[in-house]
Each structure stands twice: as C-alpha cells, then as structure tokens.
C-alpha cells in the first residue's frame, strides 16, 4: 500500500509539474499598437527605439536600448532621462540606418510617425511596435501615458510603470499646492515659445503643455483648437490684450536680448506689470515623464516670479 501511495504521489507531482511547464511555455506577452496585437514569448532584450519620445519612455522604465537615432540631439533637447553612451547611434529619426539596425539583430523595433513609411522594411528585420503621437487627433499627454503602459507591459515592467504614473499624479498635486502658496486661483498663465521676436508658438488644447498647465490649476488666457504637434504659430501682437495674465516663455530663445529691447515687447501689459518670466528648456514632444519635467519647470518659473508681485 505504501508503494502504491508513493507512486500516486509521484504521478500527481509529475502531472502538476507538466501542467505548470506547459502553462508557462505558452505564457506570452501581448501588446496592442496601431496595427493590432503583437505577441512575444518573453520580454524583448535587444531593443531599437527610433524616436526620442520612445527612447525617453523605455529609459524611464529602466530598459536600455541597443540603438536610437541622433543621440547628440536627444542629449541637447530632451536631456532626461540620460541616454547612456553604450547606445549605438543609427542616424536620423526620419532616415535611420536600416543596414546598421539589421546588423544589431534586435528583438523588437519601436517606431513612431516619422518612420511609418519604413515599417514594411523594418518588419523584415524584427517585429515592429508602432506608437505614433502628436497628430491633430491625438491628446498628446494621454497618448504618451497610454504608450508608457504599453511599453511597461512589453518589457514586464507594468508595476514600475504604474508606480511612476501614480507618482506623476501625486507630483502634479504637490506642485499645484506650491503654486497656490504664492498665488490665488484661478490663475491665468500663458505658456508659450518664441519663433522670432515677432512670432510665437501658442500651445493648442491637445498639447502636452496645455495638459500640464491644467494639472497645475492654471487657466490659459488664449485657447487654440487641436493641431498637429500641439502648436499654432501667431504674431506677437496676439498677446497685447493680456491685461491680467502671466506669460511664461520656454527656453531656448537665442534672440532673447533683441526681444527685451523691442518697444513692442516693452509695451505689453504683462511686461509692464513684471508678469513675465522664462522657463528652462523642456521637451514638449516627449513621453509620460516629460510631463513631470515640464510641470516642474513651469512651477519653478512661477515661484521665481512671485516675489515681484
């Protein structure tokens, strides 16, 4: 009887192990992009990121890609997270070096709208996940957050992705409270960029800038309908009626000295009231974590301006 009992135990354990291994053998990672579902037997290890927003997203998830385009440009304009020197540079975002990409033998290629026409060729090298953003029909911030979750799933980093998104929401509220310490709500603030001393880029309602401003409790005195890339170019005289608003302009702007010497600029109501300040350089076309960098820069600029009130 003991022998039979032992045999039954062994058979039961063997059956359990067989089911366990069969289940895990078929456990796949499935993610969805603009073209549908894609399945992977395991989290990709050799990753090529073809756009800066995607590069930022994967680095924020502690995934180091093997290659990305125009890394000097990324380090100048995007900055955070830092792109390690070990990442191979594969040319430009619009025309990445396909031969070099193929030689690196990636497990997955992450692409965005600048590479859409290359997808048939890229698919011959490795599976492609297509994550476009910044079209007229995209709410850019929400799309960046959705892509962050998609990449978290792809790389088995879902818990980290959710942790960082929770921290993002918490930081928005903390920064909003910091601003309220110095200013009463509602606070009218225009966050913009300069093209020339006479031309400005205004953030549209689908831009990351507008999303961040709303999260901080700021009200835009000029509202623009959604557009591709989240900006509308306009003449500087569009700002001449901002009597009770604050104006923040994002760096860099090489002609800043020329602007400040301009009689037209000096005549602006917000300039006369010392309600204008610069914002340190932040990237408006990044991933989910760029929203936090933008919020921090806007908050710091407003607080720097507060003692003058």
Q: At which residue positions do the language-model features occur?
A:
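Proline-aspartate-enriched helix->loop->beta-strand connector
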Residues: 105-111, 127, 239, 244-245
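A short, structured surface patch at a secondary-structure boundary
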Residues: 46, 52-100
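N-terminal signal peptide c-region/cleavage motif recognized by signal peptidases
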Residues: 20-24
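Structured C-terminal subdomain patch of bacterial secreted/periplasmic proteins
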Residues: 146, 242-309
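Short helix-initiation/N-cap motifs at beta->coil->alpha
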Residues: 33-35, 90-98, 226-236
């Amino acid at each position: 009887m003991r022998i039979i009992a032992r045999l039954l135990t062994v058979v039961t354990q063997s059956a359990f192990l067989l089911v366990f291994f069969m289940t895990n053998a078929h456990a796949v990672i499935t993610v969805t992009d603009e073209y549908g579902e894609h399945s992977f037997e395991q989290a990709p290890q050799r990753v090529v990121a073809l756009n800066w927003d995607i590069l930022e997203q994967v680095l924020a998830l502690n995934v180091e890609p093997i290659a990305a385009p125009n890394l000097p440009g990324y380090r100048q304009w995007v900055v955070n997270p830092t792109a390690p020197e070990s990442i191979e540079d594969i040319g430009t975002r619009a025309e990445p070096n396909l031969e070099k990409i193929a030689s690196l033998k990636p497990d997955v290629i992450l692409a965005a709208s600048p590479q859409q026409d290359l997808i048939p060729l890229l698919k011959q090298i490795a599976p492609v996940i297509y994550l476009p953003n910044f079209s007229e029909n995209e709410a850019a911030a929400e799309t960046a957050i959705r892509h962050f979750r998609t990449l978290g799933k792809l790389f088995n980093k879902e818990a980290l992705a959710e942790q960082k998104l929770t921290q993002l929401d918490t930081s928005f509220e903390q920064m909003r409270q910091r601003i309220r310490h110095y200013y009463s709500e509602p606070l009218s603030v225009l966050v913009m960029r300069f093209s020339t001393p006479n031309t400005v880029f205004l953030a549209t309602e689908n831009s990351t800038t507008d999303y961040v401003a709303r999260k901080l409790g700021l009200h835009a005195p000029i509202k623009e309908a959604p557009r591709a890339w989240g900006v509308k170019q306009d003449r500087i005289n569009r700002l001449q009626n901002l009597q009770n608003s604050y104006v923040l302009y994002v760096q860099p702007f090489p002609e800043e000295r020329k602007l400040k010497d301009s009689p037209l600029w000096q005549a602006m109501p917000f300039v006369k009231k010392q309600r204008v300040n610069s914002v340190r350089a932040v990237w408006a076309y990044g991933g989910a974590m760029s929203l936090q960098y933008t919020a921090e820069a806007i908050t710091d600029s407003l607080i720097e301006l507060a003692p003058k009130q």
